[in-house]
Amino acid sequence: MNAMLVLFIASALFISEHNTEEVKTTPIPNHQCVNATCERKLDALGNAVITKCPQGCLCVVRGASNIVPANGTCFQLATTKPPMAPGDNKDNKEEESN
């Protein structure tokens, strides 16, 4: 009985080891928002404005919204496309070529 249990566990470990695949990850590219810092400060009219974040990036300031000036970090905005219906792909290509 013990030998059967050991054999079962050994075969399960063997199968598990050979069937697991190494997960391939895509490296995160260095984009314009990496290592970019932004700043929340007052403009000439006394309004809080965000500056120094490249276009396409979002400034995230850690702290209450009433704290001015404050520093933050720029993050790249995700771009997504809405799902297309099966026939939409052909129509979009025709519109782009016109």
Swiss-Prot record:
Where are the compositionally biased (Basic and acidic residues) regions?
A: 88-98
Which compartments is it annotated to reside in?
Secreted
Q: Which UniProt keywords apply?
A: Complement system impairing toxin, Disulfide bond, Secreted, Signal, Toxin
Instruction: Name where it mostly resides.
Output: secreted
* Disulfide pairings: 33-57, 38-59, 53-74
Tissue-specific expression: Expressed in salivary glands.
**Looking at the UniProt record for this protein, which Gene Ontology cellular component terms does it annotate, in alphabetical order?**
extracellular region
Is Transport tagged as a keyword? Answer: no
Instruction: Give one GO molecular function term.
Output: toxin activity
Q: Enumerate the residue ranges of region (Disordered).
A: 79-98
Q: Which family does it belong to?
A: Belongs to the RaCI family.
Q: What does this protein do?
A: Complement inhibitor. Prevents complement-mediated C5 activation by binding to C5. Binds C5 at a different binding site than the other tick complement inhibitors OmCI and CirpT1, and the drug eculizumab. Inhibits the complement in human and guinea pig but not in other species tested (rabbit, rat, mouse, and pig).
Name of the protein in its database record: Complement inhibitor RaCI1
Origin organism is: Rhipicephalus appendiculatus (Brown ear tick)
Please spell out the taxonomic lineage of the organism that makes this protein: Eukaryota, Metazoa, Ecdysozoa, Arthropoda, Chelicerata
